[in-house]
C-alpha cells in the first residue's frame, strides 16, 4: 500500500487534572516556549532593576493594560473563530468527498457491467484522492497514486493540476462506456453528477488552501501582543511584586498560545498536530472502494502516539 507521511492530527482521551499540565504532544507550548521564557526573563530583569534602583512604579496603573488586553482578546477571538471556520469547512469538504467516493463506487459497480472497467474507474478515483491530498499539502503523491494507476501516475503528476486530470480521465472513461452502449444516458448522467460533485469539493479545498487570512490581522495581533507583554511588567510590579515574571509568562502563554493555535487551524491541510488527518481519510475511501469491488480492504491507519496522519 502507499507510503505515508509523518503523522498530523492528534486524537486522544481528555486528560485528567495531573496530566493536563504535562502533556506536550499536540500542545502549542513547544512553539511558544521562546516567547514565554523570554518575557519571563525580561520581566525579571525589569523587576530587579526596579528593586535595585528603588524605582516607584506605583504611578503606573494596570487598568490601561487591561483595556488593551481586552481589545487584543477580541482580535484573537476573531482570528481564532475565522481559523476554526476554515478548519471545519475543510473537514466537511473531505467528509463530503468520502460520501461522494462511496456514491461513485456504488453507481460504478451498479451501472458499468465490465468488472475491469469498474475497477479501473474506481482506482482512478482513489488516485484522485491522493493527488488532491498531495496538492493541498504540497507533497509528492506519486508513490501513493502509483499503487492504484501504476506508471500513469508519473504522467498525471506532470499536469499543472493532477487531481483535476484524474477527474477528466474518469469522465472520459465513463463517456467511453456510454458510447460503447454499455452504460445508458441516464446511467452516464448519474456518473457525471458524481464527478461534478467531486470537482466542486476539490475547488472548495483549493479555495481554502489558496486564500489565507488577511495578513493585516496577523500583523496587528503580533504587534499588540508584543507591546502588551513588553509594557506589562511595569504595570504589574507594584501589585504582584516578585510574582511579576510568573504573571507575565502566564499572559504571554495565553496571547501567543491562541495566536499559534489559530495559525495551525488556518491551514487545515498541513501536517501539524491539529491539522486534518488526510491520510486517514484517503484510507477510508480506499476501504469503501475495495469493499464495493468485493476485494479485501486495507486496514485503517493506526494512531502513532495519539497522532493520525
From Swiss-Prot:
A cellular component annotation (GO) from this entry: plasma membrane
Main location: membrane
GO-annotated molecular function: chloride channel activity
Residues passing through the membrane, by range: 32-52, 58-78, 227-247
Subcellular location: Cell membrane
UniProt entry tagged with the keyword Transmembrane: yes
Membrane disposition: Multi-pass membrane protein
Keywords for the protein's UniProt record, in alphabetical order: Cell membrane, Ion transport, Membrane, Transmembrane, Transmembrane helix, Transport
Key word Phosphoprotein present: no
PANTHER family xrefs: UPF0187 PROTEIN YNEE, VOLTAGE-DEPENDENT ANION CHANNEL-FORMING PROTEIN YNEE
UniProt record similarity statement: Belongs to the anion channel-forming bestrophin (TC 1.A.46) family.
Protein name: Voltage-dependent anion channel-forming protein mll4386
Species in which this protein is naturally found: Mesorhizobium japonicum (strain LMG 29417 / CECT 9101 / MAFF 303099) (Mesorhizobium loti (strain MAFF 303099))
Lineage: Bacteria, Pseudomonadati, Pseudomonadota, Alphaproteobacteria, Hyphomicrobiales
Amino acid at each position: 500500500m502507499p507510503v505515508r507521511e509523518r503523522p498530523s492530527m492528534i486524537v486522544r482521551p481528555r486528560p485528567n487534572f495531573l496530566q493536563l499540565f504535562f502533556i506536550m504532544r499536540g500542545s502549542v507550548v513547544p512553539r511558544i516556549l521562546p516567547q514565554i521564557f523570554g518575557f519571563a526573563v525580561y520581566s525579571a530583569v525589569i523587576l530587579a532593576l526596579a528593586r535595585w534602583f528603588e524605582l516607584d512604579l506605583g504611578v503606573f496603573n494596570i487598568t490601561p493594560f487591561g483595556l488593551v488586553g481586552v481589545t487584543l482578546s477580541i482580535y484573537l477571538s476573531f482570528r481564532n473563530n475565522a481559523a476554526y471556520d476554515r478548519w471545519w469547512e475543510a473537514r466537511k469538504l473531505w467528509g463530503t468527498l468520502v460520501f461522494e467516493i462511496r456514491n461513485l463506487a456504488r453507481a460504478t459497480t451498479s451501472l458499468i457491467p465490465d468488472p475491469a472497467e469498474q475497477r479501473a474507474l474506481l482506482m482512478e478515483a482513489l488516485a484522485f484522492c491522493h493527488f488532491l491530498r498531495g496538492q493541498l499539502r504540497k507533497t509528492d503523491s506519486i508513490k501513493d497514486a502509483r499503487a492504484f494507476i501504476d506508471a500513469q501516475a508519473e504522467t498525471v503528476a506532470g499536469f499543472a493540476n493532477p487531481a483535476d486530470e484524474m477527474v477528466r480521465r474518469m469522465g472520459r472513461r465513463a463517456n467511453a462506456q456510454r458510447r460503447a452502449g454499455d452504460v445508458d444516458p441516464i446511467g452516464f448522467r448519474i456518473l457525471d453528477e458524481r464527478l461534478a460533485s467531486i470537482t466542486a469539493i476539490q475547488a472548495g479545498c483549493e479555495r481554502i488552501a489558496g486564500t489565507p487570512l488577511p495578513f493585516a490581522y496577523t500583523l496587528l495581533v503580533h504587534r499588540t501582543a508584543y507591546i502588551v507583554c513588553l509594557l506589562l511588567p511595569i504595570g504589574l510590579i507594584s501589585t504582584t511584586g516578585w510574582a511579576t515574571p510568573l504573571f507575565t509568562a502566564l499572559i504571554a502563554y495565553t496571547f501567543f498560545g491562541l495566536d499559534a493555535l489559530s495559525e495551525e487551524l488556518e491551514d487545515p491541510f498541513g501536517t501539524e498536530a491539529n491539522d486534518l488527518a488526510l491520510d486517514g481519510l484517503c484510507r477510508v475511501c480506499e476501504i469503501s472502494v475495495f469493499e464495493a469491488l468485493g476485494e479485501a480492504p486495507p486496514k485503517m491507519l493506526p494512531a502513532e502516539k495519539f497522532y493520525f496522519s
